[in-house]
Amino acid sequence: MIENQSDNIDNKEKDVSNQDNAPEDISSEQNSTNENDELTSQKKEAINTEELKNTISNNDARLKQLEKEHETLKNQYVRISADFDNFRKRQSRDQDDLKIQIVSKTLTAILPIVDNFERARQQLQPESEEAQALHRSYQGLYKQLVEVLKQQGVSPMRVVGQQFDPNLHEAVLREPSEESDEDFIIEELQRGYHLEGKVLRHALVKVSMGPGKQNSQQEVEKDTVEEDVNSEVNTSEDV
């Protein structure tokens, strides 16, 4: 009986001892769990930081690539825009040139008619009233032709007294002149015309050789004659 009671007391003491040690075990387990959680959290943070750095680096690289592509496309747009603008200007210029070529052919065919009217006006001297009336009628037609030419952008050249220019004039005759310097136009033989600032027809002109040219030519001929005479005289003496 006494032994049983002693055993019960020992068991109770063990239970009390176990109960006293239990909180320490629980606290140790909690600390271990907290440490593991902290390590896990640190690992996750490290992983997230690395991923963020990689993401930022990739985004920077992508941004640079997009900026490069944007610059390339911008340059292409500028070139295409410039090419199109040049094409538009060239197309407009070609159309204007074609228009002038077509108009030039038509107007060039009309110019001889205008020349005939001008010759008639200079040469005809109507005496009777009937002839004068006919002359006025012709002059009316001539003025209408000139007006049509003006409306089409045709303008006559003024060449007398101007220096000879092969781009504008065609020299038909050259002769000495005491009044004009060399290579200056002294007479218009056929009128020249401009069309929109371009030459529609060259003017046929007489050009001055300058003063003294005729005398120089005569002196050359005189010297040649004298040489021939002297040569004949020398030949006679030798005989």
UniProtKB/Swiss-Prot annotation:
Participates actively in the response to hyperosmotic and heat shock by preventing the aggregation of stress-denatured proteins, in association with DnaK and GrpE. It is the nucleotide exchange factor for DnaK and may function as a thermosensor. Unfolded proteins bind initially to DnaJ; upon interaction with the DnaJ-bound protein, DnaK hydrolyzes its bound ATP, resulting in the formation of a stable complex. GrpE releases ADP from DnaK; ATP binding to DnaK triggers the release of the substrate protein, thus completing the reaction cycle. Residues 224-239 have a biased composition (Acidic residues). Residues 40-53 have a biased composition (Basic and acidic residues). It is found in: Cytoplasm. GO terms for cellular component: cytoplasm. Residues 1-56, 208-239 are annotated as: Disordered. PANTHER family: GRPE PROTEIN, GRPE PROTEIN HOMOLOG, MITOCHONDRIAL. CDD domains: GrpE. Pfam families: GrpE. Its main location: cytoplasm. This is Protein GrpE. One of its GO terms (biological process) is protein folding. Belongs to the GrpE family. Homodimer. It comes from the Bacteria. InterPro entries: GrpE (IPR000740), GrpE_coiled_coil (IPR013805), GrpE_head (IPR009012). Keywords: Chaperone, Cytoplasm, Stress response. One of its GO terms (molecular function) is protein homodimerization activity.
